[in-house]
Amino acid sequence: MFKKSIITHAPIHWLSDEEREEVAENTLSWLLELGSMTRRFEQHCHQVTVMPYQEGFIEYIEPADEQKCLPYSRRYWLREIVLCGDNVPWLLGRTLVPEETLTGEDRQLVNLRTVPLGRYLFQETTLSRDFIHIGQQNGHWLRRSRFQLSDKPLLLTEVFLPASPVYKQ
């Protein structure tokens, strides 16, 4: 049985292109980071660690707006974690992977445990990103990206917690 999602069910306000223009440049550089967020965090601390919250297969996706970002699958791999810089929680991460993506080498995604997702994804030459949506939830910045790994999709939502360097100007 799964716990309630680490990312609350509070409404997310996704920013329009016009609203993006109002975001501070430093904040926007974090939200639109194209490389590994893990590597970016490592520039601001001595050690980045993962605290797993929950992981396993699910048969349906909530909230529904995530479902619209992925093709239908009978099951999805769900992984929710807290990413810490020097043992301080900086980011909540939620990864959804259609079962069809978990083939060949990419089956390793179900065994990451305390390894940051970025360490796996950004070593792959077959990785591309379809989009980055940015928004706010309960006063926290967040972003959602759909990646293609060997032309197979996965969805990553990241919520930046108050102690995160994204809020430092």
UniProtKB/Swiss-Prot annotation:
Pathway: Cofactor biosynthesis; ubiquinone biosynthesis
Domain of life: Bacteria
Coiled-coil segments on the chain, per record: none
Reaction equation(s) it catalyzes: chorismate = 4-hydroxybenzoate + pyruvate
Keywords, sorted A to Z: Cytoplasm, Lyase, Pyruvate, Ubiquinone biosynthesis
GO biological process, one term: ubiquinone biosynthetic process
Enzyme class: lyase
Localization annotation: Cytoplasm
Keyword tRNA processing set for record: no
GO cellular component terms listed in the entry, alphabetical order: cytosol
EC number: 4.1.3.40
Binding site for substrate: 37, 79, 117, 158
Major localisation: cytoplasm
Entry annotated with the keyword Heme: no
Record Pfam families: Chor_lyase
Molecular function GO terms recorded: chorismate lyase activity
Biological function: Removes the pyruvyl group from chorismate, with concomitant aromatization of the ring, to provide 4-hydroxybenzoate (4HB) for the ubiquinone pathway.
Subunit composition and interactions: Monomer.
HAMAP family registered for this protein in UniProt: UbiC
NCBIfam families: PRK11655.1
UniProt record similarity statement: Belongs to the UbiC family.
Record's protein name: Chorismate pyruvate-lyase
Gene: ubiC
